């Protein structure tokens, strides 16, 4: 079930709905799977010329981990196929945006008082 306030998005794949989200643990698993830091992963998904299907599958797999822990990387590939690659990419993007909301207000945190 989708809950954008908690950072989760629904992905419909065939007759099943899956919940996607990117917690710290999910992002760590994604970094380990792709052997890249999250900043590089984000840059890669923002450039369609760099986007690989293996990365899409890994992104879907990692996004599923919080709510569907038993899903394997191959299961994630089947789910991506059933949902449609474009729909899966869009939903993963939404889940990433919820995990990394833009900072509002001040751009720098307040400095600690010296003492």
What is the meaning of each model-derived region?
Residues 24-41:
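Short, surface-exposed, low-complexity cationic segments
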Residues 52, 56:
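Hydrophobic (often cysteine-bearing) scaffold residues that line and stabilize catalytic clefts
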Residues 1-17, 36-51, 65-115:
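Charged interaction scaffolds used for protein-protein
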């Amino acid at each position: 079930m989708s809950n954008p306030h908690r950072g989760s998005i629904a992905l419909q794949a065939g007759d099943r709905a899956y919940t996607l989200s990117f917690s710290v643990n999910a992002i760590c698993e994604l970094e380990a799977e792709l052997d890249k830091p999250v900043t590089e992963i984000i840059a890669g998904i923002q450039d369609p010329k760099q986007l690989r299907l293996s990365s899409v599958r890994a992104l879907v797999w990692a996004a599923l981990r919080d709510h569907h822990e038993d899903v394997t990387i191959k299961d994630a590939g089947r789910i991506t196929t059933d949902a449609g690659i474009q729909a899966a990419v869009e939903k993963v993007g939404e889940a990433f945006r919820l995990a990394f909301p833009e900072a509002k207000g001040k751009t720098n945190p307040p400095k600690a008082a010296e003492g």
